[in-house]
Amino acid sequence: PPPSPEGTRQARRNRRRRWRARQRQIHSISERILSTLLGRSPEPVPLQLPPLERLNLNCNEDCGTSGTQGVGSHQISVESPAVLDSGTEE
């Protein structure tokens, strides 16, 4: 959790500085773990989006009648590649 907002300004500044340093250390360690043990790139893989020509909103059936749902899953037809695979299969 982020540091608490208590104490003097100097104490808060020191806590924030230590917290940011700890977060940087955690981030660098997690990058090393991802790259060495899992063989994955530490940077996130960019999401592969389909071309805009393949996207369509089919509003012939029940547009406006569903209330809160808006766009149903049957109205957008896009085959998404398996980019969001968690990579935790063993």
Swiss-Prot record:
Keywords: AIDS, Host cytoplasm, Host nucleus, Host-virus interaction, Methylation, mRNA transport, Phosphoprotein, RNA-binding, Transport
Keyword Transport set for record: yes
Modification after translation: Phosphorylated by protein kinase CK2. Presence of, and maybe binding to the N-terminus of the regulatory beta subunit of CK2 is necessary for CK2-mediated Rev's phosphorylation. Asymmetrically arginine dimethylated at one site by host PRMT6. Methylation impairs the RNA-binding activity and export of viral RNA from the nucleus to the cytoplasm.
Principal localisation: host cell
Annotated motif Nuclear export signal and binding to XPO1, positions: 47-58
Modified residues (Phosphoserine): S66, S73
Residue ranges with Polar residues bias: 64-78
Gene Ontology BP, a term: mRNA transport
Subcellular location: Host nucleus, Host nucleolus; Host cytoplasm
Motif (Nuclear localization signal and RNA-binding (RRE)): 8-24
GO cellular component entries: host cell cytoplasm; host cell nucleolus
InterPro entries named in the record: REV_protein
GO molecular function: DNA-binding transcription factor activity; RNA binding
Subunit structure: Homomultimer; when bound to the RRE. Multimeric assembly is essential for activity and may involve XPO1. Binds to human KPNB1, XPO1, TNPO1, RANBP5 and IPO7.
Other facts noted in the record for this chain: The Z-84 isolate was taken from a 54 year-old Zairean male.
Protein name, UniProt field: Protein Rev
